[in-house]
Regions:
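Active-site-adjacent betaalpha module
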Residues: 2-11, 45, 57-179
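A short alpha/beta connector and helix-capping loop motif
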Residues: 7-10, 25-56
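N-terminal nucleotide-binding beta1-loop-alpha1 segment
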Residues: 11-17
């Protein structure tokens, strides 16, 4: 059974939005825009934001608009971030709802989602904030993640669920971000 996303239980995980990778991502500008929007909303709502960077010496640093919004960045060499002890340690924060976005959808994002699910974690995959070089790879990743047990959400769906209602103290600020 699916539950509404809960800001008090959430951690936002931004996978590998890096300088040399983003220019080759299909609809990369939209992926980045959605990622920035979610990271800003997470900041307003007190949701931890963890980033990963796959071999930054080869793929570049996390892109500046995202880097400025991260609470922590974990460098990695494995495609599945769960294979990195610092990543798993960062998730020991008492929050059990892991919201994943980033690139590439069919490699590091998918393997991290599968790794989290294997570890019995609750995972939400943000469909409009993930990307691959080819759209068909992104769609295959969404299908596989869903079949494995991840819930597929959109960025706006997520933000409105995080707030719960229009009386939320940050509603106006987040609405302004969305529009």
């Amino acid at each position: 059974m699916s539950y509404l996303c809960d800001a008090s239980r959430a951690t936002l995980i931004i996978v590998d939005l890096q300088e040399k990778l983003m220019p080759v991502i299909d609809d990369g500008a939209l992926v980045l825009q959605r990622a920035v929007l979610l990271a800003q909303a997470a900041g307003l709502l007190g949701i931890p934001v963890i980033g990963t960077a796959q071999q930054p010496l080869r793929l570049g640093r996390t892109v500046a608009p995202i880097d400025a919004l991260l609470d922590r960045t974990i460098e990695k060499t494995s495609f599945d971030a769960c294979a990195q002890a610092p990543f798993m340690a960062a998730l020991c924060n008492g929050r059990d709802e892991l919201v994943v976005l980033g690139c590439e959808a069919h490699v590091c994002v998918l393997q991290t989602v599968l790794g989290l699910l294997h570890r019995q974690r609750r995972v939400k995959l943000v469909s409009d904030a993930i990307g691959s070089r080819r759209g068909s790879d992104k769609q295959a990743a969404i299908g596989r993640a869903c079949a494995a047990g991840a819930e597929i959400v959109s960025s706006e769906m997520l933000m409105f669920e995080w707030m719960g209602n229009s009386d939320h103290p940050e509603f106006r600020k987040i609405l302004k971000l969305i529009k």
